[in-house]
Amino acid sequence: KILTEAVTELKNDEFADLYAQDAEVKAEEEVITGEDFVAECNIESDLELLFPAEYIPSSSERMLLYRELDGLELDEDVLAYKNRLEDRFGKVPSEGLELMRVVSLRRLGKRLGAERIFLKGGRMTLFFVSNPDSPYYQSQAFGRIINFMARYPRLCNLREQNGKRSMVVKDVPTVEMAVATLQEVTTLN
């Protein structure tokens, strides 16, 4: 993880010019996503995202299941994980389902170049690549963000604070809505 972050930082800072040329060549060959610029997308939330003690009584077992979920990346893996939980413990409560949706949210955020996503107070804030000179800001991933903002100007806005660029999207009260919003962003051209 540390090595990946260091390589990403070098690509975006020290060798940004060289990588920008590489990105131009790559753009002709394939779609450039935010994953080319972000090593990981962290999620912070004020929502209740957990497996309640009533659902999984053993705290050590809950911790193991949280760790396993944190390691998942594909929707198919999350579905298999959910099925295993239901086989063992019964129907997954709503806060557990929301927790499992974080896997998709993190993947979509990374694809769009978000280093962090906050879900707080009914709003979703995506924090983009830290380096303002990064070729990310000329990529298709960021272009999709701009297109989404143009389509929904009353719903979202772009801001820059202390050199950090972010987009705030209003009326996103759940992880499910956040995932649906980012899925829509990824489909825009």
Tell where the protein language model's regions lie, with residue ranges.
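Accessory helical-bundle/CTD segments and flexible terminal tails appended to RecA-like ATPase motors
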Residues: 1-189
